[in-house]
């Protein structure tokens, strides 16, 4: 093993010029006559200079002791200080890299990549040709590219049917009811001549990933969005789902959780449809024409998708927690995927069934505003009765046949190796697989954007550029079934990722409209604001506006539903997701209706309806409605490229720990205020429907409603006292973290000033130019010192800076890991993060303090105190880690 002192020698050893000068001095000393005064000078040098040097060395070692404890990582960064300007050509300052990343992305190139990806079916495990094509393109652009495979348990549709049955004639005296088919659903989407994707022979049938096979018949019950509280409303009204087929509308929560709760309540099958009432007023009822003639939803559009229980665990349901490689043991799946059949249908196919419910059971109006707020088929004769339909008169038959096999999927990885810090890694991911032949928005707009970013970095690499840190680009397979490719990869490389990964950047539905959006952990909020301020907006109302200027600035928490899940919730890696999206319609539904009433019935002033996971998510839709001219694809590539560049090339990691502490204070304050106010204001907001759809869905998706937080509901006075004390301790822990975070951010800001802001094109403080000015920065009197002394001090100063940078960077890098609890969340131990996780009954939306809030929702105050303690311990560990 190399001695640590020896390993440091290349960093502090004198350069060849200083060595030559010393050699000349030695030769001169050996040829000169001894003079008593020279001898005296030598004694003075020994008596004065040597102690000073030794003192400086001792002080330096003492100051570096905290960093020497982490010697491997700090030595790596120390090397950057002497190598940084030598390995980076002057023309490749970060300012020049930025110019390449802004100027290289092309509208036409993005369109070309999107056309390729959407030219044929590419279901998970059925897209090797696209994987190979992606690998080859990335390799052409300079990335070291390869394909990794996993063996996944997947289903594919074999057959399905749906029929509305009505009793024939008078069956009052019959021993067995005779049924006749009143309506048979088509279960297909119309072919549109001007949209070639819809007519492809390899078009994927409508089905649910991980749905169960079955042939079931039963009465129908309308369950609204199928949230936990929707089902609770039915239970309160004594409406049973036992033996029934649940009819739910898409929206609000993850589809698999709609099926999960129906299964728990005894339903034999589930039908899911997209109600146009959720299209923000861009509907036929409001005068908009359906696609392709207008921006409204096509009546036959069907949302495919997975019904895996995503909030329990993503990934292969037979190998939870470990990679699904050939030959590994496989377990039962009942905990992770449904045991009852389900199919997705269009609203055109749902109409006869909804009408068959008319007059049976209560109506949605009897259940409050949440049930009636977005009903879009009233003009078609639907009364939105709940049912059930009379079992002796009206039933539905649902037949679903799925074929399950274990089959390979293929991730593509493209790597730009770091030149100085190769073991610090930034991962950038987009999934490639789609439910349909198209997938223009989801996911292949993101695929096209990533290609443009890889191509842009390739342009820089061809001119000699190399990143400071390693960049790994990933094209995931199997995301649509349950985040399979990314989850299996994270599970396989978990130890390495926990050590090396700095951040994960996700782009899924990269472009679906003109509105920028982001979800991220608070560490990255500042960077998102910074990058969006550097990119021109395509939607400028004032010349010179940036993406940041035209964006609300709201950054949401990360839940689940895309490939960041394994990185953040399982591995504790700082993560961010970025996108341009549509509003689903015209923004606010009332605004869209008003525009239609005034005769403005085109897509010009409203956001066209994006028909998610349908055949109409096509290149033609993107070209005509989603992003005409592909201007937002180019802008998204610029944003993504700069995000990657800052993370991969900024010497001081561009994180802000103080933003995390501020967010945590907000989260704890919310719990405290809810305890104090008993949520009366929230209850009123729910009753009047003044919450946004997103907020309403989050609340309705929880196991209990607003009275959950009413401290008066704690019967045990001691339990109430203990819980309040636990929350107070939690707040104190956040305050301690905030103090340390503020100090770390201040130190990082100071270091950025010292090493130079490379993204502005300046050389860093390690450059060998302008040394006179640098000497003044180190010490005003250093400019008067001998040359050899200045060189020595500068070298020591650079080493000291190196250790400080390493110290700060490592604390930022590992902060997110401190929030992992190895025991995992209750009954879903795969999720380790104590701050963020998908809501157990929402799936998509991010839950804050999930273990704590779920305990409160369950009314288990003892467990709530336990979780408050776990979170407190993790926060204190994080605070200690920032010191």
Language model features: what each stretch is:
Residues 199-233, 313-439, 455, 459-463:
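Soluble metallo-hydrolase cores and metallopeptidase-like ectodomains found primarily
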Residues 299-361, 476-623, 629, 633, ...:
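Metal-dependent peptidase/peptidase-like ectodomains
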Residues 83-96, 107, 112-241, 299-310:
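Noncatalytic luminal/extracellular "stalk/propeptide" segments of secretory-pathway proteins
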Residues 412, 428, 432-483, 488, ...:
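Alpha-helical metal-binding/catalytic segments enriched in His/Glu/Asp
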Residues 1-45:
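Short, low-complexity, Lys/Arg-enriched N-terminal segments of secretory-pathway carbohydrate enzymes
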Residues 779-797, 801-883:
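C-terminal amphipathic alpha-helical interaction region
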Residues 44-54, 60-129, 136, 335-341, ...:
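N-terminal hydrophobic or amphipathic helices/low-complexity stretches enriched
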Residues 190-326, 330-334, 341, 442, ...:
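Extracellular/luminal Protease-associated
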């Amino acid at each position: 093993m190399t001695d640590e002192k020896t390993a440091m020698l290349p960093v502090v050893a004198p350069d060849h010029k200083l060595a030559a000068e010393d050699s000349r001095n030695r030769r001169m000393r050996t040829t000169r006559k001894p003079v008593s005064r020279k001898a005296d000078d030598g004694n003075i040098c020994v008596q004065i200079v040597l102690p000073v040097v030794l003192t400086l060395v001792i002080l330096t070692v003492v100051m570096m002791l905290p960093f020497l404890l982490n010697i491997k990582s700090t030595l790596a960064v120390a090397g950057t200080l002497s190598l940084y300007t030598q390995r980076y050509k002057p023309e490749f300052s970060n300012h020049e890299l930025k110019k390449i990343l802004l100027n290289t992305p092309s509208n036409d190139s993005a369109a070309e990549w999107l056309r390729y990806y959407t030219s044929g079916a590419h279901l998970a495990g059925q897209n090797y040709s696209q994987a190979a094509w992606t690998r080859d393109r990335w390799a052409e652009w300079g990335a070291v590219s390869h394909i990794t495979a996993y063996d996944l348990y997947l289903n594919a549709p074999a057959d399905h049917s749906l029929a509305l049955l009505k009793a024939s004639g008078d069956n009052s005296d019959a021993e067995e009811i005779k049924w006749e088919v009143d309506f048979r659903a088509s279960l297909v989407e119309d072919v549109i001549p001007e949209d070639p994707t819809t007519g492809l022979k390899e078009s994927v049938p409508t089905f649910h990933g991980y749905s169960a096979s079955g042939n079931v018949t039963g009465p129908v019950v309308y369950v609204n969005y199928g949230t936990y509280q929707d089902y609770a409303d039915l239970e309160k009204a004594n409406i049973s789902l036992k033996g029934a087929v649940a009819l739910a509308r898409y929206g609000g929560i993850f589809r698999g959780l709609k099926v999960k709760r129906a299964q728990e309540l005894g339903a034999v099958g589930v039908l899911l449809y997209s109600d146009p009432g959720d299209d923000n007023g861009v509907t036929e009822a409001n005068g908009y024409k359906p696609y392709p003639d207008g921006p409204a939803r096509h009546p036959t559009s069907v949302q495919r998708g997975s019904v895996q229980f995503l909030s329990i665990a993503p990934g292969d349901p037979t190998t939870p927690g470990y990679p699904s490689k050939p030959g590994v043991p496989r377990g039962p799946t009942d905990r992770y995927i449904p045991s009852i059949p389900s199919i997705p249908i269009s609203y055109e196919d749902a109409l006869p069934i909804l009408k068959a419910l008319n007059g049976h059971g209560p109506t949605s109006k009897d259940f409050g505003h949440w049930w009636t707020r977005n009903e879009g088929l009233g003009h078609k004769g639907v009364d939105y009765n709940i049912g059930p339909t009379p079992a002796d008169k009206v039933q539905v038959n649902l037949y679903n046949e799925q074929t399950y096999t274990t089959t390979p999927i293929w991730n593509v990885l493209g790597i730009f190796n770091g030149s100085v810090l190769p073991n610090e890694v930034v991962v950038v991911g987009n999934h490639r697989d789609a439910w349909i032949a198209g997938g223009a928005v989801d996911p292949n707009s993101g695929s096209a954007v990533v290609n443009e970013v890889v191509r842009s970095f390739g342009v820089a690499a061809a001119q000699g550029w190399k990143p400071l840190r390693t960049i790994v680009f990933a094209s995931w397979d199997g995301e649509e079934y349950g985040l399979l490719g990314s989850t299996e990869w994270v599970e396989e490389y978990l130890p390495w990722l926990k050590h090396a990964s700095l951040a994960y950047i996700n782009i899924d539905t990269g472009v679906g409209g003109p509105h920028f959006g982001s979800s991220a952990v608070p560490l990255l909020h500042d960077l998102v604001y910074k990058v969006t301020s550097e990119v021109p907006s395509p939607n400028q109302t004032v010349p010179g506006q940036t993406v940041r200027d035209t964006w609300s600035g709201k950054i949401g928490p990360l839940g689940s539903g895309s490939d960041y899940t394994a990185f953040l919730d399982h591995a504790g890696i700082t993560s961010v997701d970025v996108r341009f999206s549509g509003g689903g319609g015209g923004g606010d539904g009332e605004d869209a209706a008003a525009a239609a009433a005034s005769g403005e019935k085109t897509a010009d002033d409203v956001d066209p309806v994006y028909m998610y996971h349908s055949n109409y998510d096509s290149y033609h839709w993107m070209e005509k409605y989603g992003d005409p001219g592909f201007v937002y694809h180019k802008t998204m590539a610029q944003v993504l490229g700069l995000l990657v560049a800052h993370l991969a090339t900024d010497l001081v990691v561009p994180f802000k720990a103080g933003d995390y502490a501020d967010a945590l204070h907000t989260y704890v304050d919310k719990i405290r205020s809810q305890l104090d106010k008993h949520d009366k204001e929230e209850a009123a907001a729910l009753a009047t429907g003044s919450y946004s759809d997103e907020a309403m869905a989050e609340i309705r998706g929880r196991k209990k409603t607003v009275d959950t937080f009413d401290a008066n509901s704690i019967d045990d006075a001691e339990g109430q006292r203990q819980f309040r004390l636990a929350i107070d301790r939690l707040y104190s822990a956040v305050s301690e973290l905030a103090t340390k975070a503020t100090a770390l951010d201040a130190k990082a800001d100071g270091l950025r000033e010292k090493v130079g802001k490379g993204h502005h094109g300046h050389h860093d403080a390690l450059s060998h130019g302008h040394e006179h000015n640098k000497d003044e920065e180190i010490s005003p009197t250093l400019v008067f010192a001998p040359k050899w002394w200045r060189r020595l001090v500068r070298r020591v100063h650079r080493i000291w800076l190196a250790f400080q940078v390493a110290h700060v960077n490592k604390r930022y890098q590992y902060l997110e890991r401190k929030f992992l609890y190895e025991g995992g969340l209750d009954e879903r131990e795969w999720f380790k993060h104590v701050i963020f996780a998908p809501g157990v009954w929402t799936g998509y939306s991010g839950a804050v303090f999930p273990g704590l809030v779920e305990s409160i929702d369950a009314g288990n105050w003892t467990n709530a105190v336990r979780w408050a303690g776990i979170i407190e311990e993790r926060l204190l560990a994080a605070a200690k880690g920032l010191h």
